[in-house]
Amino acid sequence: MITIYTAPSCTSCKKAKTWLSYHHIPFNERNLIADPLSTTEISQILQKCDDGVEGLISSRNRFVKTLGVDFEDISLSQAIKIISENPQIMRRPIIMDEKRLHVGYNEEEIRAFLPRTVRVLENGGARLRSAI
């Protein structure tokens, strides 16, 4: 089952939920602000994140700038603690299942959550349309 971590005012989160619903992909939603992640949950997400802490943090976020922390200069445990205490610094949405993780909304990349059969059918249709 897919879990999507969101924030109420996040436009990208709304787009991701709409996309998942449109494609009839069931998901559980968790509001990161109302129900912040534990340090254990953040660690589990980071294990799947190819870009490490930098892939999870929104560097343009005003809260990150206010903190004045250079995440490259601190330990992983310190970064996890800061993230757990300041969930608003995370990029959103965070979409994950048992195997995959995607941070942010990119319609092409989110397609990884479509079942393989659907991706193959849609790609075949796109190729056919481009050949015409």
UniProtKB/Swiss-Prot annotation:
It is found in: Cytoplasm. Disulfide bonds join C10-C13. InterPro entries: Arsenate_reductase-like, Spx, Thioredoxin-like_sf, Tscrpt_reg_Spx/MgsR. One of its GO terms (biological process) is negative regulation of DNA-templated transcription. GO terms for cellular component: cytoplasm. It holds the Pfam family ArsC. PROSITE patterns: ARSC. SUPFAM superfamilies: Thioredoxin-like. CDD domains: ArsC_Spx. Keywords: Cytoplasm, Disulfide bond, Redox-active center, Transcription, Transcription regulation. Global transcriptional regulator that plays a key role in stress response and exerts either positive or negative regulation of genes. Acts by interacting with the C-terminal domain of the alpha subunit of the RNA polymerase (RNAP). This interaction can enhance binding of RNAP to the promoter region of target genes and stimulate their transcription, or block interaction of RNAP with activator. PANTHER family: ARSENATE REDUCTASE, GLOBAL TRANSCRIPTIONAL REGULATOR SPX. Belongs to the ArsC family. Spx subfamily. HAMAP family: Spx (MF_01132). Interacts with the C-terminal domain of the alpha subunit of the RNAP. NCBIfam families: arsC_related, PRK01655.1, PRK13344.1. This is Global transcriptional regulator Spx 2. It comes from Lactococcus lactis subsp. lactis (strain IL1403) (Streptococcus lactis).
